[in-house]
């Protein structure tokens, strides 16, 4: 599965998050892998005759989407399912996760 793409995104996010004392590279790698799987499902490559190489090339078009979804999911650890969070005067409101997939369109098979 798109290991090169996965590694690139993990490297970038590691640079961004690496100074955080709670940073966990293993969990981040899982979040990136899951984000790639989700984009693959949303694209519905099964409806095409795309080869693995073509799929991987197409996934690079969604690099920023995959990265954003992985980062979103990583940052949601401990607050899963919440749309907002208030604690000690700090207020956070999460965007709807589905918004991150805007622009990812599925292939359809015409019968």
Residue ranges of predicted features:
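Conserved short "hinge" loops at termini or chain/domain junctions
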Residues: 1-58, 97-111
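Short loop/turn elements at secondary-structure junctions
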Residues: 54-111
